[in-house]
Amino acid sequence: PGSTFDWTNSDASIGLAASGTGNTPSFSSTNNSANPVTSTITVTPTANGCPGTPASYTITVNPIPVVVVPADIVVCNGAAVSAGVFTSTTPGTTFAWTNSNPSIGLAASGTGDAPSFTGTNNTALPVTVTVTVTPTANGCPGVPIAYNITVNPTPAVVVPADIVVCNAVTIAASNFTSTTPGSTFDWTNSDASIGLAANGTSDVLSFTGTNNSALPITATITVTPSANGCPGTPVLYYITINPTPVVVLPASITACNASTVSPSAFTSATPGTTFTWINSDPSIGLAASGTGNLPSFTATNNTVLPVTAT
Protein backbone atom coordinates (compact mmCIF):
# COMPACT_ATOMS: atom_id res chain seq x y z
CA PRO A 1 0.00 0.00 0.00
CA GLY A 2 1.18 3.48 -0.80
CA SER A 3 3.46 2.32 -3.62
CA THR A 4 3.82 4.44 -6.76
CA PHE A 5 5.02 3.32 -10.14
CA ASP A 6 7.21 4.83 -12.81
CA TRP A 7 7.42 3.13 -16.16
CA THR A 8 9.35 3.48 -19.38
CA ASN A 9 8.57 2.25 -22.88
CA SER A 10 11.50 1.25 -25.08
CA ASP A 11 9.70 1.99 -28.37
CA ALA A 12 7.20 4.82 -28.46
CA SER A 13 6.39 3.98 -32.13
CA ILE A 14 3.85 1.44 -30.89
CA GLY A 15 1.58 4.32 -29.81
CA LEU A 16 2.43 4.42 -26.08
CA ALA A 17 4.36 7.31 -24.55
CA ALA A 18 8.05 6.78 -23.77
CA SER A 19 7.43 7.03 -20.02
CA GLY A 20 4.84 7.74 -17.41
CA THR A 21 3.69 7.22 -13.86
CA GLY A 22 0.93 5.09 -12.46
CA ASN A 23 -0.70 2.55 -14.68
CA THR A 24 -0.05 2.56 -18.43
CA PRO A 25 -3.00 4.15 -20.20
CA SER A 26 -5.12 2.62 -22.91
CA PHE A 27 -3.75 3.38 -26.39
CA SER A 28 -4.20 2.50 -30.04
CA SER A 29 -1.42 0.18 -31.03
CA THR A 30 0.55 1.16 -34.12
CA ASN A 31 2.87 -0.75 -36.42
CA ASN A 32 3.45 0.65 -39.88
CA SER A 33 6.24 -1.79 -40.70
CA ALA A 34 6.11 -5.25 -42.21
CA ASN A 35 7.43 -7.01 -39.11
CA PRO A 36 6.26 -7.36 -35.50
CA VAL A 37 7.46 -4.59 -33.17
CA THR A 38 8.15 -5.58 -29.56
CA SER A 39 8.55 -2.89 -26.91
CA THR A 40 9.77 -3.47 -23.36
CA ILE A 41 7.83 -1.79 -20.56
CA THR A 42 9.99 -1.39 -17.44
CA VAL A 43 8.14 -0.57 -14.20
CA THR A 44 9.91 0.72 -11.10
CA PRO A 45 7.91 0.76 -7.84
CA THR A 46 8.57 3.25 -5.05
CA ALA A 47 7.26 3.06 -1.47
CA ASN A 48 8.09 5.37 1.44
CA GLY A 49 10.78 6.96 -0.70
CA CYS A 50 12.47 3.64 -1.34
CA PRO A 51 12.72 2.40 -4.93
CA GLY A 52 11.99 -1.24 -5.59
CA THR A 53 13.43 -3.63 -8.10
CA PRO A 54 12.33 -2.79 -11.67
CA ALA A 55 10.21 -5.40 -13.46
CA SER A 56 9.61 -5.65 -17.17
CA TYR A 57 7.03 -6.98 -19.58
CA THR A 58 6.69 -6.67 -23.35
CA ILE A 59 4.05 -5.42 -25.72
CA THR A 60 4.24 -6.83 -29.24
CA VAL A 61 2.31 -5.06 -31.99
CA ASN A 62 1.96 -7.23 -35.07
CA PRO A 63 1.70 -5.50 -38.45
CA ILE A 64 -1.33 -5.56 -40.68
CA PRO A 65 -0.09 -7.73 -43.55
CA VAL A 66 -0.40 -6.44 -47.11
CA VAL A 67 -0.88 -8.84 -50.01
CA VAL A 68 0.47 -8.35 -53.52
CA VAL A 69 -1.79 -10.00 -56.10
CA PRO A 70 -1.22 -10.67 -59.81
CA ALA A 71 -2.28 -8.22 -62.50
CA ASP A 72 -5.69 -8.81 -64.05
CA ILE A 73 -5.77 -11.87 -66.31
CA VAL A 74 -7.51 -12.23 -69.69
CA VAL A 75 -7.57 -15.61 -71.47
CA CYS A 76 -9.57 -17.47 -74.10
CA ASN A 77 -11.94 -20.32 -73.36
CA GLY A 78 -9.94 -23.53 -73.02
CA ALA A 79 -6.65 -21.75 -72.27
CA ALA A 80 -4.48 -22.57 -69.27
CA VAL A 81 -4.49 -19.94 -66.51
CA SER A 82 -1.26 -19.86 -64.52
CA ALA A 83 -1.34 -20.12 -60.74
CA GLY A 84 -2.12 -16.88 -58.92
CA VAL A 85 0.91 -16.36 -56.66
CA PHE A 86 0.36 -14.07 -53.67
CA THR A 87 3.19 -12.42 -51.73
CA SER A 88 3.65 -10.23 -48.67
CA THR A 89 6.58 -8.51 -47.03
CA THR A 90 5.34 -9.79 -43.68
CA PRO A 91 6.95 -13.17 -42.89
CA GLY A 92 4.57 -16.05 -42.26
CA THR A 93 1.63 -14.43 -43.99
CA THR A 94 -1.09 -16.82 -45.11
CA PHE A 95 -3.73 -16.14 -47.71
CA ALA A 96 -7.41 -16.98 -48.08
CA TRP A 97 -9.19 -16.20 -51.36
CA THR A 98 -12.67 -16.28 -52.84
CA ASN A 99 -13.80 -16.43 -56.47
CA SER A 100 -17.06 -14.71 -57.43
CA ASN A 101 -17.92 -17.16 -60.24
CA PRO A 102 -16.63 -20.76 -60.20
CA SER A 103 -18.05 -21.39 -63.70
CA ILE A 104 -14.70 -20.23 -65.14
CA GLY A 105 -13.06 -23.40 -63.81
CA LEU A 106 -11.59 -22.04 -60.55
CA ALA A 107 -12.99 -23.15 -57.17
CA ALA A 108 -15.19 -20.76 -55.20
CA SER A 109 -12.59 -20.39 -52.45
CA GLY A 110 -9.27 -21.64 -51.21
CA THR A 111 -6.15 -20.94 -49.18
CA GLY A 112 -2.59 -20.30 -50.26
CA ASP A 113 -2.00 -19.42 -53.89
CA ALA A 114 -4.81 -19.79 -56.43
CA PRO A 115 -3.99 -22.94 -58.43
CA SER A 116 -3.57 -23.08 -62.18
CA PHE A 117 -6.70 -24.12 -64.07
CA THR A 118 -8.24 -24.27 -67.52
CA GLY A 119 -10.37 -21.22 -68.24
CA THR A 120 -13.94 -22.16 -69.16
CA ASN A 121 -16.61 -20.04 -70.81
CA ASN A 122 -19.43 -21.81 -72.61
CA THR A 123 -21.44 -18.63 -73.19
CA ALA A 124 -21.33 -16.14 -76.06
CA LEU A 125 -20.08 -13.26 -73.89
CA PRO A 126 -16.91 -12.63 -71.84
CA VAL A 127 -17.12 -13.76 -68.19
CA THR A 128 -15.19 -11.67 -65.65
CA VAL A 129 -14.76 -12.87 -62.06
CA THR A 130 -13.32 -11.16 -59.02
CA VAL A 131 -10.76 -13.02 -56.94
CA THR A 132 -10.53 -11.45 -53.47
CA VAL A 133 -7.45 -12.26 -51.39
CA THR A 134 -7.25 -11.69 -47.62
CA PRO A 135 -3.81 -11.92 -45.96
CA THR A 136 -3.33 -12.96 -42.32
CA ALA A 137 -0.14 -12.84 -40.25
CA ASN A 138 0.34 -13.50 -36.54
CA GLY A 139 -3.43 -13.68 -36.16
CA CYS A 140 -3.93 -10.25 -37.73
CA PRO A 141 -6.01 -10.01 -40.92
CA GLY A 142 -4.96 -7.58 -43.62
CA VAL A 143 -7.02 -5.57 -46.05
CA PRO A 144 -8.56 -7.77 -48.77
CA ILE A 145 -7.20 -7.05 -52.26
CA ALA A 146 -8.97 -8.10 -55.47
CA TYR A 147 -7.94 -8.86 -59.02
CA ASN A 148 -9.99 -9.93 -62.04
CA ILE A 149 -9.89 -12.93 -64.35
CA THR A 150 -11.71 -12.61 -67.67
CA VAL A 151 -12.38 -15.70 -69.78
CA ASN A 152 -13.42 -14.77 -73.30
CA PRO A 153 -15.75 -17.13 -75.18
CA THR A 154 -14.99 -19.18 -78.26
CA PRO A 155 -16.96 -17.34 -80.96
CA ALA A 156 -19.17 -19.37 -83.29
CA VAL A 157 -20.01 -18.36 -86.85
CA VAL A 158 -23.23 -18.96 -88.76
CA VAL A 159 -22.60 -19.35 -92.51
CA PRO A 160 -25.04 -19.47 -95.45
CA ALA A 161 -26.44 -22.68 -96.89
CA ASP A 162 -24.50 -24.26 -99.73
CA ILE A 163 -24.83 -22.41 -103.05
CA VAL A 164 -25.31 -23.96 -106.50
CA VAL A 165 -25.48 -21.73 -109.60
CA CYS A 166 -24.79 -21.83 -113.32
CA ASN A 167 -21.77 -20.35 -115.01
CA ALA A 168 -21.96 -16.54 -115.40
CA VAL A 169 -24.72 -16.15 -112.78
CA THR A 170 -24.34 -13.43 -110.12
CA ILE A 171 -23.99 -14.86 -106.61
CA ALA A 172 -25.33 -12.73 -103.76
CA ALA A 173 -23.07 -11.69 -100.89
CA SER A 174 -22.58 -14.27 -98.13
CA ASN A 175 -23.18 -12.70 -94.73
CA PHE A 176 -21.64 -14.24 -91.62
CA THR A 177 -23.06 -13.76 -88.11
CA SER A 178 -22.11 -14.62 -84.53
CA THR A 179 -23.78 -14.29 -81.14
CA THR A 180 -20.48 -12.99 -79.73
CA PRO A 181 -20.39 -9.19 -80.11
CA GLY A 182 -17.44 -7.79 -82.03
CA SER A 183 -16.69 -11.01 -83.89
CA THR A 184 -14.64 -10.73 -87.06
CA PHE A 185 -14.37 -13.29 -89.82
CA ASP A 186 -11.53 -14.56 -92.00
CA TRP A 187 -12.34 -16.83 -94.93
CA THR A 188 -10.52 -18.88 -97.52
CA ASN A 189 -11.71 -20.19 -100.89
CA SER A 190 -10.26 -23.48 -102.12
CA ASP A 191 -10.70 -22.65 -105.83
CA ALA A 192 -10.34 -19.05 -106.99
CA SER A 193 -11.21 -20.09 -110.58
CA ILE A 194 -14.90 -19.72 -109.67
CA GLY A 195 -14.47 -15.94 -109.68
CA LEU A 196 -14.01 -15.41 -105.93
CA ALA A 197 -10.71 -14.37 -104.34
CA ALA A 198 -8.65 -17.01 -102.55
CA ASN A 199 -9.19 -15.35 -99.16
CA GLY A 200 -10.64 -12.33 -97.44
CA THR A 201 -12.05 -10.84 -94.27
CA SER A 202 -15.60 -9.97 -93.20
CA ASP A 203 -18.43 -11.11 -95.49
CA VAL A 204 -17.96 -12.64 -98.94
CA LEU A 205 -18.99 -10.00 -101.47
CA SER A 206 -21.26 -10.64 -104.44
CA PHE A 207 -19.46 -12.03 -107.51
CA THR A 208 -20.13 -13.64 -110.89
CA GLY A 209 -19.70 -17.40 -110.81
CA THR A 210 -17.25 -18.66 -113.42
CA ASN A 211 -16.74 -22.17 -114.81
CA ASN A 212 -15.04 -22.53 -118.17
CA SER A 213 -14.68 -26.29 -117.90
CA ALA A 214 -17.04 -29.10 -118.85
CA LEU A 215 -17.58 -30.31 -115.29
CA PRO A 216 -19.09 -28.74 -112.14
CA ILE A 217 -16.59 -26.95 -109.88
CA THR A 218 -17.18 -27.00 -106.13
CA ALA A 219 -15.18 -24.61 -103.96
CA THR A 220 -14.93 -24.95 -100.18
CA ILE A 221 -15.35 -21.71 -98.26
CA THR A 222 -13.79 -21.97 -94.78
CA VAL A 223 -14.83 -19.26 -92.34
CA THR A 224 -12.95 -18.70 -89.06
CA PRO A 225 -14.48 -16.33 -86.48
CA SER A 226 -12.45 -14.35 -83.93
CA ALA A 227 -13.51 -12.23 -80.95
CA ASN A 228 -11.44 -10.58 -78.22
CA GLY A 229 -8.34 -12.21 -79.64
CA CYS A 230 -9.85 -15.69 -79.43
CA PRO A 231 -10.29 -17.79 -82.59
CA GLY A 232 -13.40 -19.88 -83.04
CA THR A 233 -13.91 -23.20 -84.79
CA PRO A 234 -13.76 -22.90 -88.60
CA VAL A 235 -17.05 -23.65 -90.39
CA LEU A 236 -17.40 -24.70 -94.03
CA TYR A 237 -19.89 -24.15 -96.79
CA TYR A 238 -19.70 -24.91 -100.49
CA ILE A 239 -20.22 -22.98 -103.71
CA THR A 240 -20.79 -25.09 -106.83
CA ILE A 241 -20.61 -23.50 -110.28
CA ASN A 242 -22.14 -25.71 -112.95
CA PRO A 243 -20.65 -25.38 -116.46
CA THR A 244 -22.38 -24.10 -119.57
CA PRO A 245 -22.87 -27.37 -121.50
CA VAL A 246 -21.78 -27.51 -125.15
CA VAL A 247 -23.53 -29.83 -127.62
CA VAL A 248 -21.72 -31.68 -130.39
CA LEU A 249 -23.99 -31.97 -133.46
CA PRO A 250 -23.86 -34.45 -136.31
CA ALA A 251 -22.82 -33.26 -139.75
CA SER A 252 -25.48 -31.72 -141.97
CA ILE A 253 -27.68 -34.29 -143.67
CA THR A 254 -28.83 -34.37 -147.29
CA ALA A 255 -31.50 -36.92 -148.25
CA CYS A 256 -33.78 -37.70 -151.18
CA ASN A 257 -37.55 -37.49 -150.96
CA ALA A 258 -39.05 -40.63 -149.44
CA SER A 259 -35.69 -41.89 -148.16
CA THR A 260 -35.13 -42.90 -144.55
CA VAL A 261 -33.03 -40.53 -142.45
CA SER A 262 -31.12 -42.31 -139.68
CA PRO A 263 -31.35 -41.06 -136.06
CA SER A 264 -29.01 -38.18 -135.14
CA ALA A 265 -27.21 -38.47 -131.78
CA PHE A 266 -26.18 -35.40 -129.79
CA THR A 267 -23.24 -35.50 -127.35
CA SER A 268 -21.65 -33.23 -124.73
CA ALA A 269 -18.52 -33.34 -122.60
CA THR A 270 -20.66 -32.37 -119.62
CA PRO A 271 -22.10 -35.49 -117.95
CA GLY A 272 -25.86 -35.59 -117.55
CA THR A 273 -26.53 -33.11 -120.35
CA THR A 274 -30.01 -33.35 -121.85
CA PHE A 275 -31.07 -32.01 -125.22
CA THR A 276 -34.12 -30.14 -126.52
CA TRP A 277 -34.43 -29.48 -130.25
CA ILE A 278 -36.68 -27.61 -132.63
CA ASN A 279 -37.14 -28.05 -136.37
CA SER A 280 -37.76 -25.00 -138.52
CA ASP A 281 -39.76 -26.91 -141.19
CA PRO A 282 -41.82 -29.92 -140.10
CA SER A 283 -42.84 -30.48 -143.75
CA ILE A 284 -39.66 -32.53 -144.20
CA GLY A 285 -41.23 -35.30 -142.11
CA LEU A 286 -39.59 -34.47 -138.75
CA ALA A 287 -41.64 -33.15 -135.81
CA ALA A 288 -41.43 -29.45 -134.99
CA SER A 289 -39.68 -30.13 -131.67
CA GLY A 290 -38.58 -32.83 -129.29
CA THR A 291 -36.13 -33.94 -126.62
CA GLY A 292 -33.19 -36.29 -126.69
CA ASN A 293 -31.71 -37.41 -130.00
CA LEU A 294 -33.39 -36.87 -133.39
CA PRO A 295 -35.41 -39.95 -134.32
CA SER A 296 -35.27 -41.69 -137.64
CA PHE A 297 -37.84 -40.33 -140.12
CA THR A 298 -38.85 -40.52 -143.79
CA ALA A 299 -37.69 -37.46 -145.68
CA THR A 300 -40.52 -35.66 -147.49
CA ASN A 301 -40.39 -32.97 -150.19
CA ASN A 302 -43.45 -32.51 -152.38
CA THR A 303 -42.06 -29.40 -154.08
CA VAL A 304 -39.85 -29.03 -157.13
CA LEU A 305 -37.03 -27.39 -155.18
CA PRO A 306 -34.76 -28.61 -152.35
CA VAL A 307 -36.12 -27.91 -148.86
CA THR A 308 -33.64 -27.09 -146.07
CA ALA A 309 -34.71 -27.31 -142.44
CA THR A 310 -32.63 -26.06 -139.54
Predicted regions and their residues:
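Extracellular low-complexity Ser/Thr/Asn/Gly-rich intrinsically disordered segments
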Residues: 1-310
